[in-house]
Structure formats: C-alpha cells, structure tokens
C-alpha cells in the first residue's frame, strides 16, 4: 500500500493513538468506535454512503425459455448481453443450454445490474441464429423461440386466407354468353342512359328498359360512348365486351353513375396512350377470366363505386389506375393479373384486394386507403394506409414508404413481405400468434422520431435485416436497426441475418413466385465470454488511497448453464499497485469439497505453485482446512511476475509504476463428481486477496457480499466490523466489464464522476464505470 498520501498518513497517526492498527491481532485495549467511524468517514472519498447498498454491480437473473422447432433437431440456446449478429458486435455470452422441440428451459445467469435487456438466441443445426431481444423484468426473462405449428421441413400453400375478403365471381360464363345474345349492339356516339323518347333512341326497345344490356360489336369498335346518369329512366346499364370484340378507347369515354362494363373471355378493351376510361359514382368494371383491358392509357374511377365491387379475373395491363374524389371508397377485387405503371388511390376507404398477381412500378395510396394481399404483389414504391398480408402470400417492393399515422401492416402466417431498398417501420407491424411471418428488409429508413414513437414489430414475425448498422447508446441517437433490437421488436418478434430465417415458403408459380428457404451457410458469430474485473484496496481494515488498483484481476467466466461437471476460469493479474506481498484466492460458495474430483491448472501453473511457497496460502490445488472449496490463485503477486526478495515495484498502474508487456494468466479447471448449475458470479464466486500480518491467520479482503473469512483466514475484529458495517465502506469492487482502473494515487471519484452518485444511492448510476471523467485510468 502506498503511504505517501496525506489522508492515509493522518489516518495512520490517528489509528496508532487508538491501537487500531493492531486490531487484527486482537489488541483492542484502546479501541474507540466513534473515532474510528470518524476516520473512515473522513478518509473515504464518498460521504453519506447508501446504508442499504452492498456495492454489487451485477445481479442474478432467471430465464424461462420455451423452445419450438423441428422434431429431431437439437438446438443451442444462448443468452447474450448485446446483439450477437452485428458485424461490430462485442456481445458476450451469459448462458448456454441445449434444447429440442417443446423444451422449456429455466436457467439462472449473471449480468450487469445496469443491463435491462438480453438477446436470447436459438441456434439450429446449420448454426443459424434466431434472436429475440427480451427485457429483464423483476429479475426474470421470458422468451419464446420458434413457433408451435412447425413440425416438418416442408410447407405448402394454405387453403384459407382468413384476413383477406373473398368474392364469388359476379357472373358465370354461361350467364354472360346467354345475355350477350339478347344484348343490343352499341353504335358510335350513343348515350346509353338516354330516355325512351329521346331522338333516335325512341325506336329501340332497350331504351325503354330499367336495366339495359348492351354489347360491343364484333371486330374493332373505335367510336365513343357514354352514359350520363339516371335522367333517362335507366337504373343500370351493362356493357358486354364479348369474345371477338375489341373496344378501342382513343380519347376519353365517361360512364356516369350506373354503368357496369363486363369484359367476357376473349373480349378486349384497348385504351390508347393519353386516353381514359372514366367511371364515376356507381360505375364499375367486371373482367371475366380470359378478358382483358390493355394499353398505355388510364382507368379513372372517381367519386367511388357506390358499394359496387370492381372485379378482375382476367388481365388488366395499362398505365394508370387512378381512384380519387369523394364517396365511401372503391372496392377493387383482383383474381387475375393487374399490371400497372402506377396505382394511385386517394378516396378514403378504398381497398385493393388481391387474390391473383399485381405488378406495378408504383403503388401510391394515401393514408386512408388499404391493400389486402392474399397472393402475389410486386412493386417499386409501395405506399398505403394499411396493408394486410394474407396466409401464404408474398409481396415484394423496392421502397416501403410512409405517408402518415396508422400505416399499419398485419401479416398472417406464412406471409412474406420483402423490401429490397429502404423500408419505413414508423408503424405497427403485427404478426400471427400461431404460425410465422417473414419481414425481409434491406435497410430500415431513418425517419425522424422513430425512436420516440410507439412503432413496433410484434408477435411471431422474423425480421431478416441486411443493414444491421448499430449506433447510439441513448435512444435519441439510435440508428434504425438499434431502435429495432432495443425497442421495436416486441411480443415474441425475432430477427436474423439475411438468408438465415427459420421459414419455408415454397415457390408455386402462382401466388408464391419467388418463395423462400434459408441457406445452409452458418452465421459468423464470435463467442465471447463475459469478463469481470475485481479491484482491491490492500490496506484493510485501515483506510486506503482508494485508487482500487492494489490488485486488479480480470476473470473470464464460463457461460451459465445447468447440469455441468466442469468449470473453467481464466484469471489475468492485470495490476499490482502495492509494495507488500499480496496473494489471491477463489472461494466458490455452494460447492462442498466432497464433490470435487480434481482442481487443475493450465497456463500459469508453474508460477502459481512457486508463489505459494510464501505461506499465505496452502501450497495445494485447493485448501484442505474447512469444508468450503478455496482455491489459492497465487501467494505472491510480485513473484509471478519474476520479482523476488525485496523487489516489489508497483506494476501496471501508470505514473511511475513499472509497465507490464505480458499479463500473467492462470487457467483454473475444476472437475466435479456430481453435476451442478454454474455458480453465480454475484452470489457464488468469492475472489479475494490476502496478506500475512502479525496474526497466525492471513488477513483477507473480500467483496462486501462475501464478507466472511475462509477457514485459514480472518477479517478485522468484531468491533471494527461493526463500525465498517455502520459506515458501509468497501475495500473491493467487482465490475462486470474490463475495468479501466484508476492510475496510481488517483482517487476513484476523480476518475469516475458518477461513482459518488452511485455510492450515495446504489440503485442509480449502476453503469458509472462506463463514464470516465479523466485520463487517469488504465485502459486496455
């Protein structure tokens, strides 16, 4: 311990006056508890320490994980402290278990107290990761990985599309064939809604009827037609484009209010470039199987179809389908092929329902229009009010836009939505509760306010994201992908790397044209074990200089798990900021020595054995005295670095200390007779340091939660311990990271500005070690 600090020197004089320095030798004749309390309070860098704080920065969490998957497949379940899939990931594994279909796992693991979310991964036989971010609530994590309806490796198109309305064909082929026989052939320039006494119409019986049936003549018909409403007494006008007829619309033909245009199998409407077929109010179209509307012109529906449904079971292939104006919305039901350069809809309530194929350069619906896709849809820009993806459907777009609030998406089981460019997730995307949906996105659009919004992806949706750029610690700095994994994925939603989704959608050439099956290449995920740092002050039970670098250990921990019989700990002696002999040991609470088959050592074994000749610890693989498992790590910190005799420089603590180029590492291997759960770092791993004073037993310095001596050691006297308890000082810290410890003589509060705040209230600022307030720390 360094004795050149004024506070420490003052303390030593005071302590001498009350014979405190000899208290560990049971010489307490002048002990004064009040004066000792004052000394502790004056020398420790933080006043008014949290009386209920135990100085722990980690906690034990229990995970409950339901695993579903394919029968006969063995899965790995791994829990990480961060996103394991990011190319820049530093995620550390916290727990690992094996599982099969239907397994419910319960496993306890340790993590930083500051950690509020973990990433639970299911890894299949191809080493594909399905990852679910899960919030830690009340010390527990609950996750569901995989989906209960998956039992085989094959999947066929479902019969039902429960969320997509269906429509029976309005006519049979026989009905239209019969009707056209009696229908009146139209002539150029007719107003099909004319009254029975109007001009030349008076001699034609059809104009006396309430429901009037007309047909386009055979061959090519180029002349204009129109209807102008109900003033002529007609209630409905039906125009059949029969087989063998081609209706050429070369300008604009407008049909007001009461017209249905029916294209029979083999009938054709061609709309020329710059020409428009205009349907207003209760006018609408019906395209039978085999019928077609083609050309470079426009179909324009305005002021709604008044409750009538437009129906296409043939082919519509034109430039623009435009729907605008007032009314309650246009219903357009597609059972055939709809090919467009552009679909533009702005009439509130308009719904485009697809049970066939839709291909468009742009689909641009405002935020009061809807798309319901039960089959195949492909577009460039994709914008709408709401979207429903039906059971076993596929939609592909280049850009998934956003045009206002409530642009929500519902995805049913076996549906797949793919965006090859940027996709806005400024919305709620709701997946199935039974079965799985796949959301494939190249890049999530970076929209202002996304992180603060209530947007989410929820239920059984797998998100396959290509751009996994992760930025930002605070929510207001999150990149879109950081938002997704930290907040956006909810209620069982998961994510994976491209091509790795546990999802099968076979292409059938009809509704599923591209389909999906995962590749067999493994995910490239580096497994990093958690490293905890143990930082000690050696002058216990006297006050120290509180730079917490007298001994600094980095300990690599095994992942938590159940039923293990082998434990491995890798211990790095990172710093020795003391000039006296110090040793270190590990007591594992919960392991009785009778259950130990063997304790062995890998790297560092020779230095360890030779250092134990100092006598602080037994020179054995574990100590024989007592029932607890106590493993000596080294008996002389300087010796393992090659310093003997009186050579005891400060090592690797900055300032004038001696730097270390090679860190001493000791591998500790423990074999047990009977399986146990991995011991908790918070409640079970008691790393401590010790020195030999004037007493027969060594003096030990433990973390506060392990503040009891081993069989071969001692703490301070009872009276001193009572004062320490009242003041609640500490001489040891366990930091759940590679701790950048203070340099020589730098008080910890000068290195970490939030340390004092945490000490005052240890329920706050539990991540203080992430905020370095000076350059007086040792980073590595």
Predicted regions and their residues:
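Acidic/polar, low-complexity intrinsically disordered N-terminal segments immediately downstream
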Residues: 24-201, 490-542
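Extended low-complexity, serine/threonine- and proline-enriched intrinsically disordered segments
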Residues: 72-87, 578-621, 683-695
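Short, well-ordered beta-strand segments enriched in hydrophobic/aromatic residues
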Residues: 63, 555, 566-575
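Bacterial N-terminal signal peptides that target proteins for export
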Residues: 1-10
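C-terminal motif of bacterial Sec signal peptides marking the signal peptidase cleavage site
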Residues: 19-22
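Beta-strand elements of well-folded, non-transmembrane domains
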Residues: 557-561, 573-579, 590-592
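Extracellular beta-strand-rich, repetitive "passenger/adhesive" scaffolds
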Residues: 163-499
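A eukaryote-biased signal for long
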Residues: 621-780
């Amino acid at each position: 311990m360094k004795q050149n600090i004024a506070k420490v020197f003052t303390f030593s004089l005071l302590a001498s006056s009350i014979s405190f320095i000899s208290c560990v030798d049971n010489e307490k004749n002048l002990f004064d508890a009040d004066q000792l309390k004052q000394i502790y309070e004056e020398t420790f860098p933080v006043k008014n320490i949290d009386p209920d704080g135990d100085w722990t920065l980690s906690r034990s969490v229990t995970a409950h994980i339901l695993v579903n998957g394919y029968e006969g497949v063995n899965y790995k379940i791994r829990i990480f402290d961060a996103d394991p899939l990011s190319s820049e990931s530093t995620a550390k594994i916290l727990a690992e278990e094996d599982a099969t279909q239907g397994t419910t796992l319960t496993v306890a693991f340790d993590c930083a107290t500051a950690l509020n979310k973990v990433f639970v991964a299911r890894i299949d036989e191809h080493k594909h990761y399905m990852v679910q971010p899960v919030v830690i609530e009340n010390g527990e994590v609950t996750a569901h990985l995989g989906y209960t309806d998956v039992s085989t490796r094959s999947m066929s198109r479902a019969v039902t599309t429960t969320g997509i309305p269906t429509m029976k064909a309005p006519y049979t082929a026989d009905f239209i064939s019969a009707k056209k026989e009696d229908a009146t052939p139209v002539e150029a320039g007719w107003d099909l809604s004319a009254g029975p006494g109007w001009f030349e119409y008076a001699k034609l019986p059809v104009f006396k009827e309430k429901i009037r049936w007309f047909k386009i003549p055979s061959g090519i018909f180029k002349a204009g037609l129109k209807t102008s409403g109900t003033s002529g007494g007609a209630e409905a006008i039906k125009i059949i484009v029969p087989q063998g007829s081609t209706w050429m619309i070369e300008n604009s033909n407008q049909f007001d209010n009461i017209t249905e245009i029916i294209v029979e199998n083999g009938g054709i409407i061609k709309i020329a470039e710059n020409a428009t077929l205009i349907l207003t109010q209760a006018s609408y179209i019906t395209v039978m199987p085999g019928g077609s509307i083609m050309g470079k012109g426009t179909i324009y529906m305005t002021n709604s179809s008044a409750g009538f449904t437009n129906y296409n079971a043939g082919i519509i292939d034109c430039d623009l389908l435009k729907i605008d104006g007032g009314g309650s919305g246009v219903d357009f039901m597609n059972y055939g092929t709809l090919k467009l350069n552009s679909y533009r809809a702005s009439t509130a309530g308009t719904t485009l329902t697809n049970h066939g194929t839709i291909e468009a350069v742009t689909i641009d619906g405002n935020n009061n229009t809807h798309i319901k896709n039960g089959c195949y849809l492909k577009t460039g820009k994709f914008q709408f009010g709401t979207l429903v993806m039906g059971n076993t459907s596929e939609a592909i777009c280049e850009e998934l836009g956003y045009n206002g609030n409530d642009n929500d998406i519902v995805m049913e089981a076996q549906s797949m939505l793919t965006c090859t460019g940027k996709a806005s997730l400024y919305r709620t995307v709701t997946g199935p509760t039974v079965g799985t949906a796949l959301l494939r996105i190249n890049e999530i659009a970076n929209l202002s306010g996304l992180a603060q919004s209530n947007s989410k992806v929820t239920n059984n949706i797998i998100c396959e994201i290509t751009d996994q750029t992760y930025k930002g610690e605070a929510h207001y700095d999150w990149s879109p992908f950081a938002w997704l994994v930290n907040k956006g994925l909810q209620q069982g939603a998961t994510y994976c790397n491209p091509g790795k989704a546990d999802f099968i959608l076979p292409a059938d050439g009809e509704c599923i044209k591209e389909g999906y099956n995962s590749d067999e290449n493994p995910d490239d995920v580096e497994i990093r074990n958690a490293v905890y740092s143990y930082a000690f002050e050696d002058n216990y039970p006297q006050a120290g200089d509180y730079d917490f670098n007298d001994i600094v250990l980095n300990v690599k921990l095994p992942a938590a798990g159940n039923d293990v019989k082998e434990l491995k700990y890798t211990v790095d002696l990172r710093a020795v900021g003391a000039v006296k002999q110090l040793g270190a040991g590990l007591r594992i609470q919960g392991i009785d020595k009778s259950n130990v088959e063997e304790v062995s050592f890998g790297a560092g074994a020779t230095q360890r054995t030779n250092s134990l000749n100092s006598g602080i610890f037994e020179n054995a693989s574990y100590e024989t005295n007592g029932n607890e498992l106590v493993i000596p790590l080294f008996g002389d910190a300087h010796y393992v670095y090659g310093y003997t005799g009186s050579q005891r420089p400060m090592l690797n603590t900055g300032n004038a200390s001696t730097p270390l180029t090679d860190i001493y590492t000791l591998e500790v291997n423990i074999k047990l007779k009977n399986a146990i759960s991995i011991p908790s770092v918070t409640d079970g791993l008691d790393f401590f340091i010790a020195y030999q004073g004037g007493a027969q037993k060594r003096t030990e310095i433990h973390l506060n939660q392990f503040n009891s001596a081993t069989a071969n050691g001692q703490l301070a006297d009872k009276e001193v311990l009572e004062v320490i308890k009242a003041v609640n000082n500490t001489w040891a810290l366990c930091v759940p990271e590679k701790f950048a410890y203070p340099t020589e003589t730098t008080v910890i509060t000068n290195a970490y500005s939030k340390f004092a705040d945490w000490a005052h209230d240890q329920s706050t600022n539990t991540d203080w070690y992430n905020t370095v307030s000076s350059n007086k720390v040792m980073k590595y």
